[in-house]
């Protein structure tokens, strides 16, 4: 293939990449999201919300793909892997039990809780269809500390 064909292919790929609608944003809870935890991850401040006993509530308009990024706090002296759980309730009827087990990541720090370390992130994806959806995140009874999302 000659150089003209390569340039047309590259131009087409660049055009497709820039015209495709890619968007990612942090969703704030519509209910019970007053308490926040700021973690320092790779020298950047990241905002997390703890899942307490009353849970977190979100209202989302679809179609969309949601990614739940969670971490679990542990005391600095603990070095082994830790398991943590939480529950996702979609539209008040469908329940998803999410279980993670991750090791402690040494590079993450908290401004509010300097004596804690945090696990590697546990990611969970949900695809939502068109329409308005309510999502409720609930704490598992087995977790000693609140899961951060």
List each model region and its residues.
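Extracellular and analogous surface-interaction loops
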Residues: 55-66, 125-131
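Short coil-to-beta strand junction motifs in C2/discoidin
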Residues: 78-87
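Short edge beta-strand/loop segments characteristic of extracellular beta-sandwich folds
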Residues: 69-73
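Bacterial N-terminal signal peptides
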Residues: 10-18
